Each structure stands twice: as structure tokens, then as C-alpha cells.
């Protein structure tokens, strides 16, 4: 199927697609900041340069675009039929032009994502993936972001349990009589 746009129009259209500071990423960042979570962006020292890094919790958040990262699973409220008897994410559709190119590109992206997530986990980082369709759709955005904050709070509690010193146990067996501060016969005047 031929492309409906000229090469110049297609180039202009594709050049406007952002890799950083996308709308879904900004929604997640604003919500996290409003709930007291401080973070760094696109940490170059970590595999895959994660979108959001919360060092204190050793957690990275990847905000993936459904098309570029090949998201095929639908979010719960609004799946789209794929014409083959199944459902898919409504933001992921394989282009009708240059199908081989796009399929290979998306598969490479998915493989790289898998490798980056595994590398981060091996380094001891918690990895959370949020899909574009989970924050683009208003009816599930709030639910997704609340779930994210609950997950981060749970990670924070787990870290606090690990860092908390062991409770020191004392032996309260009476080995000698305790000394009294005041004699029983003393009648203090108040």
C-alpha cells in the first residue's frame, strides 16, 4: 500500500515525534512530584537511560510509547479488536507501508527493552513500566498513577524494614532488688 504522504511530509511528521518529555512522561512526573517523590531524568549511567530514576528507592520508571515499544496487550477498560479474534492496545498498529522494516524495528526495540530491564534488575534496581495507553486514557490515568504511588510506597516500606536496626531484647529477670529513690517512710511535701 503506497504512503499517502510525500517523503517530505512524512519526514516532517516523523521529525516531530519526541523521545523525551512526552505527554505521558510529563503526566507521570507531575503526579510523582505532587506526591512527594523526587527523581532524576534519563540517567546516562544506567542501562537504557531510564525515563525516571528514584535513587532513594533504587527504582526506575520506564514510560513506554505503545507504538515504539510494541505494546500488544490492551489496558483493561478499552481494548480494541485486532480483526483476528483477539484484542490489542489501540495505540499499536503495524504500519501498512514498509511492513518488514517496521516489524524488525519494533522487534529490535522490544529485545533492547528486555535486555535493559534485565540489566537494571541485575544491578539491584526495581523496574516499573508504564505504557502510554495507561496514562493517555483519562478513565484509567488516575487509577494507574495511584497504583504507581502505592507501589513506590510499598518499595519505600520494604527498604525501611531492611535498614531498620534489629530490636534489642532485654532480660528483665530480677537478680537483685532494685534500689528505691525515696524511702518509704519519707513523706515528701508537695
List each language-model region with its residue ranges.
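Nucleic-acid endo/exonuclease domains
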Residues: 1-79, 83-129, 133-190
Amino acid at each position: 500500500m503506497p504512503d499517502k504522504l510525500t517523503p517530505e511530509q512524512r519526514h516532517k511528521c516523523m521529525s516531530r515525534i519526541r523521545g523525551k518529555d512526552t505527554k505521558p512522561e510529563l503526566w507521570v512526573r507531575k503526579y510523582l512530584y505532587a506526591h512527594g517523590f523526587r527523581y532524576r531524568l534519563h540517567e546516562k549511567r544506567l542501562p537504557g537511560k531510564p525515563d525516571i530514576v528514584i535513587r532513594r528507592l533504587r527504582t526506575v520508571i520506564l514510560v513506554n510509547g505503545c507504538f515504539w515499544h510494541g505494546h500488544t496487550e490492551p489496558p483493561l477498560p478499552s481494548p480494541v479488536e485486532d480483526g483476528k479474534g483477539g484484542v490489542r492496545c489501540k495505540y499499536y498498529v503495524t504500519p501498512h507501508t514498509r511492513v518488514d522494516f517496521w516489524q524488525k524495528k519494533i522487534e529490535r526495540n522490544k529485545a533492547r527493552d528486555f535486555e535493559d530491564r534485565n540489566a537494571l534488575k541485575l544491578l539491584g534496581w526495581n523496574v516499573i513500566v508504564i505504557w502510554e495507553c495507561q496514562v493517555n486514557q483519562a478513565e484509567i490515568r488516575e487509577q494507574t498513577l495511584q497504583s504507581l504511588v502505592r507501589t513506590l510506597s510499598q518499595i519505600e516500606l520494604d527498604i525501611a524494614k531492611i535498614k531498620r536496626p534489629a530490636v534489642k531484647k532485654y532480660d528483665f529477670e530480677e537478680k537483685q532488688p532494685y534500689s528505691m529513690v525515696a524511702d518509704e517512710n519519707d513523706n515528701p511535701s508537695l
